[in-house]
Amino acid sequence: METVEIRSKSLLIQWLTVESNSLLSWQLHVKRKSIKFDIYHKKNDTSSLLDGSNKNTDRSILHTKRQHTHEAGIKKLSAAGLELFYQGERCMSEKPSEGSVYIENGGLYAFVFDNTFSKTKPKTVTFLLTAQPYNGPRIPNASVHGSPKQIISGTLLKKRRKKGQGYARRYFTLNMVEGTISYYANENSSVMRGKIPLSIAVISVAAETHEINVDSGVELWNLRAHTHQDWLRWCNALEKAKNSQTSSKLVVDERTQESSSNQLVSIYSRLRECLDIAQLYRTSRIKSASSHNFSVPEIRIQLPGDAKENKETRTSVEITAAENAQAAVTLRKVTRQLGSLLHELECFIQHHEYTKERTAQSSPSSRMSMDSNFEQHWYDAEDYESTTSQLNHYSESGAHAADATKSSVAHNEKVEDISDSDIPIMKTSSNSTSLDADRDSDTSSISDTSSNSSAPHEQLNATSLASTVDESSRSPPLPEVESNKENDIKRKQPFHDLMDSSSPDDSSFANAKSDEEVQKPSVSKNIADGAVISIPKPLTPKPSDSNSLYPLPHSKVGRRKNIPAITVPPPSILSILRKNIGKDISSIPAPVVSNEPCNLLQRCAEDLEYSNMLDKANECDDDIKIFYVAAFAVSNFSNMRHKERSVRKVFSPLLGETFELVREDRNYRFLAEKVCHRPLIIACHAESRNWIWNHSPKPIQKFWGKSVELNTLGPVTIKLACGTEFSFMKPACFLKNVAIGEKYVEPYDHMEIVDETTGDKAVIRFKSGGMFSGRSEDVLVTVIRSNGEEDPKCLQGKWTSHLDFVNTDEGNVIERIWEVGPLVDKPEDHCGMTVFAAQMNEITDLEKDKLPPTDTRLRPDQRYRENNDLDHAEPLKLELEQKQRERRKEMEEKDIKWEPRWFVPSVAGDDEDEDGSGPIWQLKKENNYWESRENSTWSSCPKLW
C-alpha cells in the first residue's frame, strides 16, 4: 500500500496502465476528514500531458490559486485529454473505501484524488490500486463492486432553523454502512453541520411535495428534493439504510418474541372477558323490566409473572351476579382491580409493540415502500362521516371474548362504559382482530372512530370506559362547580398537550345512544337541577358608558385554589399520531378522558396571568418599557413548566363559543371567541386602564414521529396608555418524547419584540438543549436600540421560574422583575395547573347570572370532565360535535357564511398575512359584548348546547 498527501485546493493524479477486459480495484483510507476521488480515461488522440516535467512519472499534482479551484482543476483535466470514466464518492475518515470497476478497453487511466474543496487542510491518504484480468461476463461500462455503494450523496433543500426563512441548498451524505445521514453547507465544504443516526430517527415522506422529514427526537430536518426522481433515489437509499440498521440490532430470538406476544394477547383476552361480563351484567339490569337472576360463569384470570423470579400467579374470581347489594359490591371491586391490571398490561404491550414495530417499520408487508409513487390522503375528522346507529344491549347468551378473537373486525373503535372506576382502555381495530368483533350488533353506547393498523394486537386506541355497576337509568344532576373531591386512584399514562389537537367538531365518534339514554333527561334540565349553571333572564336595559371598563371596578370576590383531582390517567394515542406524521394533527379525534378541564379559549386567557408586567411597563421610563414587555412575553410559556401539563390536551371550542375573564384584583377584562373553524382562529381582546392587548391566534400542530411542533400564528399587539405600542410573534414550541419517555414542552429558537414607536427591538433567545440534557429552560433577553447599538442591560433567567434585570457592564443583578406564580397543591394530580388556570372554569359572583349562553363555563361536557364524571362527559361531547356538524351542513346548503358575534376582521379582511396568520380581529365597538352583558341581552347568541 502507498501513502500520499494531497495539499489543500489540489488534485493528485495516480496514473495506471490497464489491459483490456480487466478489473480495476481500489482500497483507500483517509486519515483526516474526507477526500473525493474519480477515475478518468486518457484519450488516445491527445498527445499533450498535464506537465512536461511529469511526462515520465506516474503521478501528477494540479494546484491552482483561483477562487473556483475545483472547476479550474476539472478544466485542466479535460484540456489534457482526460474524460470522466467513473464518478467516485466522498470517502470519510471513519470508514475505509473499497470497490472495483470493469475496464473493457485498455489504456492509460488516471485515479484522481480531489481535495480542492479544502481551503487550508491537507489530506493524507493510504491506498492500493490493482488491475487484474477479468474472465467473467462482459458488462461494458458497468461497476462490479464487491459490496453495495457505501456513500450516497447529493444536494437537497433543507428548511432553515429560523422561522420564516424558507429552504436552503445543502449537501447531504448517507452512509449506508453506519446508517447515518449528515450534511454540509455545499459540496466543497469539509465542515459537517449535522449528523443523525437513522436507527433512532423517524422518517416520513410526501410524494406530492417531494418532502423527506427526519426526526431524531432532538432535532428535526425538513428536506425537499429538486425532482421526483431525486426524491425516489433518496427514499430508496434511506429505506435500505434504515432496514440494514434495524436488522443488525435484532438480538431477541423471533420465536421468543412470538411466544411472548401470544402470551400477552391471551392474558388480555381473559382480562377483557371479565370486563365484558361486568358490562353484560350492568346492561342486563337496566334492560330487564322484571326482576330475575342472571348467572355469570366462573372466570379464571392468570396474571403476568414477575420478570425476575419468573413466577406465575393465579387468581380465581367467582362472580355470581344476583339482584343483591353484595353482588354489586363484589363486581365493582373485581372490575376496579382488573382495570388497574389492564392499565399496567397496556403499558407493557405498548412498549412491546413499539420495539417490535421498529424492526418491521420499513418492511413492505407493514407499510407502503417509500420508493413507490403513492399519494397519502389525510382526512379531516370533521369531514369523516360518522356512523350513527341504534344498538341493542348485550344478550344473556352473548359470546365470550375468547371466541371473539377469531373473527375480524368489521367496524372501528368502540367506546364502552364499565363500572365507576373510570378505566382508560386503548384499542385500535381496523384491520386487526378485536375481542368485541362479534358484538357489533349487541353493544350499547358504542361510538366508532377510524384507525388503521396492521398488527394483530396493535396497541390499544384511546377509549374512555366509565360507568357505575349499580347506577340507575336516570342521569344524576350536574355536580357543583366548587366540588373538589379527590379520588384515591392515582395513575399516570403519558399523553401530550397539543393545544388544539382535537376539535369537538373534528371527532369521528358516532353519536350513538341506547334506548335508556333516549329516555334520560336533557342536558339543560340536568344543569337546572344542579342549580349552579343557569342562563340569566333579560333585565331592564341600562345605558353603557363607552369609556368605562364595565363591570370594573368591582369588590373583591373569592376564588378557588384548585380543581377536583384528575384521577383517570390519559390514554396514549401514539397509534393514531404515527399515521399522521408531517401533517396538521388538529383534526385527530380523541376521547374526553384525554382532555384536561380547560378550554383553548381559557388557555389563551392564561397569557394574561402576569398582566402586572404591562402595568409596570406603562409607568416606567421609556428605555425600560421594552424589558417589561419582554418579561411579559416570556411569562406566556410559564404555565407549561410542570410536565404533567404536557400529557393532556385542552378542550377545543365550538364555533361561536366565547369566554370572558374579569379580574377585579388585576383590573382588566378579557374576551375570546372562536371566529373560524377551518383554519382554527381564536379572536382575543383584553383591556385595562393602563394597556390594551390583542391577539388572534391560529394554532397549527404537526407530528414528526418523536416530537410535536406547536406553532401559534398571529401577532400579539400591545398598546400602553402612555402611547407606546409593541408587537411580537410567538415562537414555535416542541413537545418532546411523544413516543416514549417523559414528555415536556419547550420553546424553540428565539422571538423578537418590536417597539413600533421608537424602533427598538428586544431579542429573546431560548437556549437549545442537547440530546441528553432534557428540557432547556435558560433564556436571555437583549435589546437593540433603533440606532443599532445593543443596550448594556439585559434580562437573564429561566422561563420556568424568574427573570433578572442585569447590567452586563458591571456584571451585577439590578433587580428581579418577574417571578412565577404558585401551582396548585399536588399539581401531579391536578394536570399540573397553576392557581390562575384552576380559577378559569369557576363561576364567581362576578359571572353569576351574567354570562351569555355561549360561555365556556356553561359547557356541560367540560363541566362533567372537571368533576370526573366521564360517563356523562363522553356522550355529551359527541352530541355537541354532531350538532355542530349539522349546523355547518345546513349553512353550506343555504350558502350562509358564518359571522362572529363579537369580533370583526381588520381592514385587511380575509386576506392572508405574509406569515399566513390571516386578518387581525378587533372587538366590535357598537352592540359589543360588554354592552350586552351590562343589559343582559343575549338574544343574538347561537345555541351551542
Curated annotation (Swiss-Prot):
Subcellular location(s) per record: Cytoplasm
GO cellular component assignments: cortical endoplasmic reticulum; cytosol; perinuclear endoplasmic reticulum; plasma membrane
Domain PH span(s) in chain numbering: 149-243
Ranges annotated as biased composition (Low complexity): 443-454
Biased composition annotated in UniProt, kind: Polar residues: 460-470
PTM annotation (Phosphoserine): residues: S288, S419, S421, S503
Ranges of Basic and acidic residues composition bias in the record: 482-499
SMART domains per the UniProt record, alphabetical: PH
Listed GO biological process terms: endocytosis; ER to Golgi ceramide transport; exocytosis; intermembrane lipid transfer; maintenance of cell polarity; piecemeal microautophagy of the nucleus; sterol transport
Chain residue ranges for the region called Disordered: 396-555, 846-894
Gene Ontology molecular function: oxysterol binding; sterol binding; sterol transfer activity
Domain GOLD: 1-131
InterPro entries: GOLD_dom (IPR009038), GOLD_dom_sf (IPR036598), OSBP_sf (IPR037239), Oxysterol-bd (IPR000648), Oxysterol-bd_CS (IPR018494), PH-like_dom_sf (IPR011993), PH_8 (IPR041680), PH_domain (IPR001849)
Keywords: Cytoplasm, Lipid transport, Lipid-binding, Phosphoprotein, Transport
Family stated for the protein in its record: Belongs to the OSBP family.
Name of the protein: Oxysterol-binding protein homolog C23H4.01c
Organism: Schizosaccharomyces pombe (strain 972 / ATCC 24843) (Fission yeast)
